[in-house]
Amino acid sequence: MPELPEVEVTRLGLVPHLTGRRIVRAVVRHHGLRWPVDPALPELLGGRTVARVLRRGKYLLIECVPDIAHGPQAGAGWLLVHLGMTGTLRVLETPAAPGTHDHLDIELADAAGRPITLRYRDPRRFGAVLWHDGDEAALSAHPLLRNLGIEPFDTRFDGDWMYARTRGRSAAIKTVLLAGDIVVGVGNIYCSESLFRAGIRPTTAAGRISRPRYAALAEAIRATLADAIARGGSTLRDFVGSDGQSGYFQLDALVYDRAGLPCRVCGTPIRQIVQGQRSTFYCPACQR
């Protein structure tokens, strides 16, 4: 599943291609994603201009502003995209016939009329493409966004933030991080990696971790995610960036998917356990 780094890599790739371009038309081939695609989406998008491409957690947020043809009452709207398990957004600068799993095309043009196509592909159809009317404040109240935790690169996110929000919590720290209500985007791969960097065993009760150890964990989360973004994310199955390139963070993973292999720090064999139906990897010597 694409996690925060993969979504951010996609966003960074889309920004120079989409920002300021006018949407010529949208073609929906399959409406049956995780939630049905609005049948009116082509009409809602046509003629609008992409103002910004943002990210909140694992959601891509594409702001589409109206032109005069939409009438004086028309306001900004947002395209919310979640990549699900196997979704990708590709920018096509030359025409290409759609494949079986290419569910949505958004055709855009710049001021000179040069066309590009934004194509959404999702073999398993667990992703989502939703429309939301309103400004950014209204968007933040969307049911899918309003309960998300803080962004890991927000300056307010630190050890004190995590310590204060985990008092009395008996659940394992990895389970708490994956829930996303304290900090967003620390998915399964990067959770194992961050906990290793911080020297914290993933089964440790969140409420028993000290303030200094949370400071180390907050820094490890930021560093791990930043490294992953710089390496184009992780490609475990289907993920590619908007340019079609695979990520390679997983090639240098410290613990993830390395069960039985020697720890890169101390040489102890990496262990694998299951937490909440997800595989967890850790070093029993380095993580306490």
Curated annotation (Swiss-Prot):
Its cofactor is Zn(2+). Keywords: DNA damage, DNA repair, DNA-binding, Glycosidase, Hydrolase, Lyase, Metal-binding, Multifunctional enzyme, Zinc, Zinc-finger. A zinc finger (FPG-type) spans 254-288. It catalyses: Hydrolysis of DNA containing ring-opened 7-methylguanine residues, releasing 2,6-diamino-4-hydroxy-5-(N-methyl)formamidopyrimidine; 2'-deoxyribonucleotide-(2'-deoxyribose 5'-phosphate)-2'-deoxyribonucleotide-DNA = a 3'-end 2'-deoxyribonucleotide-(2,3-dehydro-2,3-deoxyribose 5'-phosphate)-DNA + a 5'-end 5'-phospho-2'-deoxyribonucleoside-DNA + H(+). GO terms for biological process: base-excision repair. One of its GO terms (molecular function) is 8-oxo-7,8-dihydroguanine DNA N-glycosylase activity. DNA binds at H101, R124, R169. The keyword NAD does not apply. The active site is at P2 (schiff-base intermediate with dna), E3 (proton donor), K58 (proton donor), R278 (proton donor). Pfam families: Fapy_DNA_glyco (PF01149), H2TH (PF06831), zf-FPG_IleRS (PF06827). Its EC number is 3.2.2.23, 4.2.99.18. Binds 1 zinc ion per subunit. Belongs to the FPG family. Monomer. Involved in base excision repair of DNA damaged by oxidation or by mutagenic agents. Acts as a DNA glycosylase that recognizes and removes damaged bases. Has a preference for oxidized purines, such as 7,8-dihydro-8-oxoguanine (8-oxoG). Has AP (apurinic/apyrimidinic) lyase activity and introduces nicks in the DNA strand. Cleaves the DNA backbone by beta-delta elimination to generate a single-strand break at the site of the removed base with both 3'- and 5'-phosphates. PANTHER family: FORMAMIDOPYRIMIDINE-DNA GLYCOSYLASE. This is Formamidopyrimidine-DNA glycosylase. It comes from Ralstonia nicotianae (strain ATCC BAA-1114 / GMI1000).
